[in-house]
């Protein structure tokens, strides 16, 4: 029976060093291989030109490098780029490059499909197949960084975990990927340029705070009225608003990092005074800002963008209470790359 080889990128640098020592080689070989895997983005052991042929053969016999492949790439009329990324087992996720005049942002996926069941999101209609490995997350960023340099002549400036999946339900792998992205041996990006978005997994928000992470936190809130929130995001019955509020207060107490609430206003759902007042009240519990996001409809038409007047009612109420609020217009709608639209048909 053939033994399945392990993805070498699942090993830490210390584990790689130990592997070489156990196999009667020098520990520094682990450093060389680690640099090839992360700093240089090697997809094959044959790429490792300063490693001896015998050592490369030993690696081939024991490990694989499970790298991703950009299957298809689409460019929007507004400059947005969407990648359909094929994983080593044939599954596909999507990632997006969002350019503006001052920055280029990578929107990356953390799961194949999604663990949650938000009724307004196309990704949530996909069955969750599996979590992404740290290397698969890292490779999405690497691919978008290359595209940013190619198309916009500048490196990637920001990363948001707002693609397919709930990042906090793949917590360990997301953290490992971010550690490599921010490491001098990886991309060397500041954690302050990284935002992890969650739909409100309270216990994991507390864990992040305890782990003293340095990246930013965004919460897809969409309603501060429990009944409405439970209807549009059924899983939130397990994470009620008082529990979420407590977790966010704990986060701010530990990190002193302001929270961003992501909020879509829908016609006939949360475009009413009760919802506006509830959001204002919820925002007063912890320093925050609110992004009011343009809705990107999916096929069935159940959810519709609220009127500009309804959105302005939110802005006026929030600003009157000293809360920063901005309307975020979606990018890449013509290629289904906008928020809530990622749902590759091949999955």
Swiss-Prot record:
GO cellular component: cytoplasm
Swiss-Prot/TrEMBL keywords: 4Fe-4S, Cytoplasm, Disulfide bond, Iron, Iron-sulfur, Metal-binding, Methyltransferase, rRNA processing, S-adenosyl-L-methionine, Transferase, tRNA processing
Function: Specifically methylates position 2 of adenine 2503 in 23S rRNA and position 2 of adenine 37 in tRNAs.
Major location category of this protein: cytoplasm
Localization terms from the record: Cytoplasm
Provenance organism: Flavobacterium psychrophilum (strain ATCC 49511 / DSM 21280 / CIP 103535 / JIP02/86)
Leader sequence segment: none
Family label: Belongs to the radical SAM superfamily. RlmN family.
Domain Radical SAM core residue range list: 100-334
MF terms in GO: 4 iron, 4 sulfur cluster binding; metal ion binding; rRNA (adenine(2503)-C2-)-methyltransferase activity; rRNA binding; tRNA (adenine(37)-C2)-methyltransferase activity; tRNA binding
GO biological process: rRNA base methylation; tRNA methylation
Name used for this protein in its record: Probable dual-specificity RNA methyltransferase RlmN
Catalytic residues as annotated in Swiss-Prot or TrEMBL: 94 (proton acceptor), 339 (s-methylcysteine intermediate)
NCBIfam families xref list: rRNA_mod_RlmN (TIGR00048)
Cofactor: [4Fe-4S] cluster
């Amino acid at each position: 029976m053939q033994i399945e080889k392990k993805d070498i990128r699942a090993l830490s640098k210390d584990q790689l060093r130990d592997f070489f020592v156990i196999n009667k080689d020098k520990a520094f070989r682990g450093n060389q291989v680690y640099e090839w895997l992360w700093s240089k983005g090697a997809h094959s052991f044959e790429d490792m030109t300063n490693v001896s042929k015998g050592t490369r053969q030993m690696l081939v016999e024991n490990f694989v490098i499970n790298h991703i492949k950009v299957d298809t790439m689409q460019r929007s009329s507004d400059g947005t780029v969407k990648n359909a990324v094929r994983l080593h087992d044939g599954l596909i996720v999507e990632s997006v490059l969002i350019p503006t005049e001052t920055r280029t942002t990578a929107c990356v996926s953390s799961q194949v499909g999604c663990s949650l069941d938000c009724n307004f999101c196309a990704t949530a209609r996909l069955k969750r197949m599996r979590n992404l490995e740290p290397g698969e997350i890292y490779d999405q960023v690497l691919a978008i960084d290359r595209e940013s340099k190619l198309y916009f002549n500048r490196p990637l400036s920001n990363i948001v975990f707002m693609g397919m999946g709930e990042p906090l339900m793949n917590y360990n792998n997301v953290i490992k990927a971010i550690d490599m992205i921010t490491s001098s041996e990886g991309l060397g990006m500041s954690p302050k340029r990284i935002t992890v978005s969650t739909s409100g997994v309270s216990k994991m928000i507390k864990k992040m705070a305890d782990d003293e992470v340095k990246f930013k936190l965004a919460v897809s809130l969409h309603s501060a009225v429990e009944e409405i929130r439970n209807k549009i995001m059924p899983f939130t019955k397990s994470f009620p608003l008082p529990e979420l509020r407590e977790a966010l207060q704990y986060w701010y107490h530990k990190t002193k990092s302001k929270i961003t609430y992501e909020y879509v206003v829908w016609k006939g759902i949360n475009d009413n005074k009760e919802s506006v007042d509830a959001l204002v009240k919820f925002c007063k519990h912890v320093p925050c800002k609110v992004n009011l996001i343009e809705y990107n409809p999916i096929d069935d038409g159940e959810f519709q963008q609220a009127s500009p007047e309804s959105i302005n009612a939110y802005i006026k109420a929030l600003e009157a209470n000293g809360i920063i609020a901005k309307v975020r217009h979606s990018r890449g709608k013509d290629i289904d790359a906008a928020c809530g639209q990622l749902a590759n048909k091949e999955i």
